[in-house]
Amino acid sequence: MKKTFTGVVVSDKADKTVSVKVERRFMHPLYGKVVTRSKKYAAHDEQNEYRIGDRVEIIAVRPISKTKTWKVTRLIERPRGIETTAVETEGGNA
């Protein structure tokens, strides 16, 4: 069974790669407080189809590059009302 995580895409700038932030919550062993920790994983995105804010599932695969050993398997949720176009992302020459 391969490891799978669920996280949010925080960067899609690189070609065929997205950065996925995975958060985990646990009870502190001494103080009993619920603590949140996060880690970013570089995940393979062959078609460049995932955007910032998408909730995705990633799975461990063989090493694709030096830092990339995860692959996006499916889109879980896409935020509503966030559609970017090429004109908006380039910025104008105001």
Swiss-Prot record:
Q: List this protein's GO terms for biological process.
A: translation
Keywords (alphabetical) are: Ribonucleoprotein, Ribosomal protein, RNA-binding, rRNA-binding
Which GO terms of the cellular component aspect does the record hold?
cytosolic small ribosomal subunit
Q: Which InterPro entries match?
A: NA-bd_OB-fold (IPR012340), Ribosomal_uS17 (IPR000266), Ribosomal_uS17_bact/chlr (IPR019984)
A GO molecular function for this record? Answer: structural constituent of ribosome
This protein's assembly is summarised as:
Part of the 30S ribosomal subunit.
Name of the protein: Small ribosomal subunit protein uS17
Q: Which organism was this protein described from?
A: Deinococcus geothermalis (strain DSM 11300 / CIP 105573 / AG-3a)
